[in-house]
């Protein structure tokens, strides 16, 4: 049975076991294009395995599934990092679990409440 998870606030220290927190408010901002655009500089470093593998960027748009949210699937991506960042300013949930061989360790699964300006990379 999967445990009932209580979200905790997302922070660099609370998420360190799983990856990095990306935060627009803590990232160097550079004004470009005659001050019409702000670049949030070097928020994440992309890693792929092997190192010469092609790296791509995709954008996914998910739907709000409501609460209580039942987690019935988790993914694992051992050959490269992924970053998740909201397209809106709305808070969102990040549910992660450490690897336990070939599947997630459900007993150590954690839920984080991310602010609309925060993303994660792992």
Language-model features, listed with the residues they occupy:
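Short acidic-glycine-tyrosine-enriched beta hairpin
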Residues: 103-121
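Non-catalytic, conserved peripheral segments adjacent to functional cores
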Residues: 1-107
């Amino acid at each position: 049975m999967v445990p009932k998870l209580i979200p905790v606030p997302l922070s660099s220290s609370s998420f360190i076991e799983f990856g990095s927190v990306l935060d627009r408010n803590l990232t160097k901002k550079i004004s470009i294009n005659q001050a019409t655009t702000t670049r949030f500089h070097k928020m994440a470093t992309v890693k792929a395995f092997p190192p010469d593998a092609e790296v791509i960027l995709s954008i996914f748009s998910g739907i709000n599934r409501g609460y209580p949210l039942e987690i019935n699937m988790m993914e694992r991506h051992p050959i490269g990092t992924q970053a998740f960042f909201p397209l809106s300013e709305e808070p969102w949930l990040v549910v992660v679990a450490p690897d336990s061989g070939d599947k997630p360790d459900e007993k150590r699964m954690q839920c984080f409440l991310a602010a609309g300006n925060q993303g994660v990379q792992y």
